[in-house]
UniProtKB/Swiss-Prot annotation:
Its main location: cytoplasm. The active site is at C149. One of its GO terms (cellular component) is cytoplasm. It comes from Bacillus cytotoxicus (strain DSM 22905 / CIP 110041 / 391-98 / NVH 391-98). This is N-acetyl-gamma-glutamyl-phosphate reductase. Transmembrane segments: none annotated. Coiled coil: none annotated. It catalyses: N-acetyl-L-glutamate 5-semialdehyde + phosphate + NADP(+) = N-acetyl-L-glutamyl 5-phosphate + NADPH + H(+).
Length: 345
């Protein structure tokens, strides 16, 4: 399948290039940028020398449709709202890494993103691309809304509990921490080295834009779902997300039952690895890979469950899951081109 990448010079776009250039069935036919048209990609990213000969092109749908079958949009929020309808009308399939098509309700998008929403016509076409839980829908989709990085880790961690109504819906607390690449390529004060190094920032407390897409999925799994408490932190590493979920158990359950629940639910999910009871993952153990590692603990004294999930925010949290979804759209094995061993140490 021939693919194009729009927004190729951001961190998500560069990770897509790395994965797709090594993919056995996808071929990159063009890469596109808003600000660096005419430049060679290696002028910004010298590590790609010898691997790529692409020059960044302007975004012209007519030209793209002559070469590509599928387009990856690695653009900021508010951009794909305008581009996606044009691409779909041109007969192209789209994997959108932004948040523009994740929400079913346009007013909720506008409330959280402070931008005009896409039309309901196209929002209804979009399939939320949480690969492990939406495989069948993704295979039929023309437009896949790739989930946010925090949302991916959170939803994979909480899905077995919510779907089986094991926890009290009003007791969910999520403590999420991300490496600085999650803040994007554009420099910010919080991501400035003297501010970030040897420090820890909390930001967007209960205001992060991934909250509504998490709650949207929770309601779909359990109609009794309530708003969640969700905090995000910036940590001084380049890649990685750790989500720690706390919730009160509805009735007494043995930890072995909880562990078996996760193991059975994810037994056919290649990229979800459940740790043995009492063992919890670290972000370095998934770095550079498409894996989500999950550890489960239960405090009988407080009747609370603790679930820890880690992902690489650039892989399972962005480009890796986008390629996984593209594999599904192309009716390939979803593991194709993604079986990278994590980089360690």
């Amino acid at each position: 399948m021939k693919v194009a990448i729009i927004g190729a010079t951001g961190y998500g776009g560069i990770e897509l290039i790395r994965l797709l250039q090594q993919h056995p069935y996808f071929s990159i036919v063009s890469i596109h940028s808003f600000s660096q048209v005419g430049e060679h990609i290696t002028s910004s990213y010298p590590h790609l020398r010898r691997f790529l000969v692409y020059t960044l092109q302007e975004i012209d749908v007519e030209s793209i449709k002559k070469e590509a079958d599928l387009v990856f949009l690695a653009t900021p929020a508010g951009v794909s709202v305008k581009l996606t309808p044009l691409l779909l009308k041109a007969g192209l399939k789209v994997i959108d890494l932004s948040g523009d098509f994740r929400m079913v309700n346009p007013s909720i998008y506008e409330m959280w993103y402070k931008k005009p929403a896409a039309s309901e016509e196209f929002l209804q076409q979009a399939v939320y691309g949480l690969s492990e839980w939406k495989r069948d829908e993704i295979q039929q989709a023309k437009l896949v809304a790739n989930p946010g990085c925090f949302a991916t880790a959170t939803l994979l961690a909480i899905a077995p509990l919510m779907r089986n109504k094991i926890i009290e819906e009003n007791s969910i607390i999520i403590d999420a921490k991300s490496g600085v690449s999650g803040a994007g390529k554009t420099p910010t004060h919080a991501a400035h080295f003297p501010e970030l190094y040897d420090n820890l920032h909390i930001y967007k407390v209960n205001e992060h834009q991934h909250i509504p897409e998490i709650e949207q999925m929770l309601i779909g799994w359990n109609e009794q779902a309530k708003p969640i408490t969700f905090s995000t932190h910036l940590i001084p590493v380049s890649r990685g997300i750790m989500v720690t979920l706390y919730a009160k158990i509805r009735k007494y359950v043995q930890i072995e039952e909880l562990h078996n629940l996760y193991t059975n639910i994810y037994k056919n999910a290649y990229f979800v690895r459940i740790r043995p009871y009492g063992e919890f993952p670290s972000i370095k153990e998934v770095r550079g890979s498409n894996y989500c590692d999950i550890g489960i603990g239960y405090d009988e004294r407080t009747k609370r469950i603790t679930v820890v999930a880690v992902i690489d925010n650039m892989m399972k949290g962005a480009a890796g899951q986008a390629v996984q979804n593209a594999n599904l759209v192309a009716r390939l094995d979803e593991k194709t081109g993604l079986q990278y061993i994590p980089i360690y140490p």
